[in-house]
Amino acid sequence: MVDDKDLKIPEHVAIILDGNGRWARAKGMPRSYGHVKGCDNLEKISDVAIEIGIKYLTVYAFSTENWKRSKEEINGLMKLFRQYLKKCKKMADKNHMRITVLGDPTAFDEDIQESIREVQEYSAQYNEHFFQIALNYGSRDEIKRAVNKIADDVRAGKITGEISEDIIASYLDTAGLPDPDLLIRTSGEQRLSNYLLWQLAYTEFVFTDVAWPDFHREELMDAIRQYNHRDRRYGGVK
């Protein structure tokens, strides 16, 4: 058994933050309570990730499909996003962390879009740690947007010759980031839900029954322990 101090820490961890609403319902509370607690936990886990040596953390906070939820729940989530984005500059300073929002921000109200721009511009000064938050993100939408941009640049003569994987990757929301080494999904579901479909080609998956608000340092370390028992061959043979 590998001692925790000897664990290989994945450089890039992606997390699907799932189970806030069900966690709250199980406690007899409204779904909004779960989202608040889940948001609080995100700040804590981002600190833990940096503490243990994870350089890149990418979290799935709001998908393109989540707009189908009730108006009341959507309004509550927008309020949370506004509050969280206001904290992000202090988080960036504390952890020397660059914060990037993945997805299409144009669906949000202008004040949220402006907060996203401000956080990204402000935190661009840091390159020690990288925190990506997927908001109004769907991988198929990301790929569609990338293909349209590539087509525009081909027509403009900016791209000639064959379209390589590297070219496609450079047009994705995650351009410049390494692919995730480890994906964690909380709350027992075992599916990708349209998350980072291009980027997860050789990523190791860990699914946990623990809901996101209860996912703390020990649960993260347990996922990393499981990761350390995987043999990553990238399609080859060892």
Question: What kind of region is each of these model predictions?
Answer:
Residues 1-238:
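Flexible, compositionally biased loop and terminal segments
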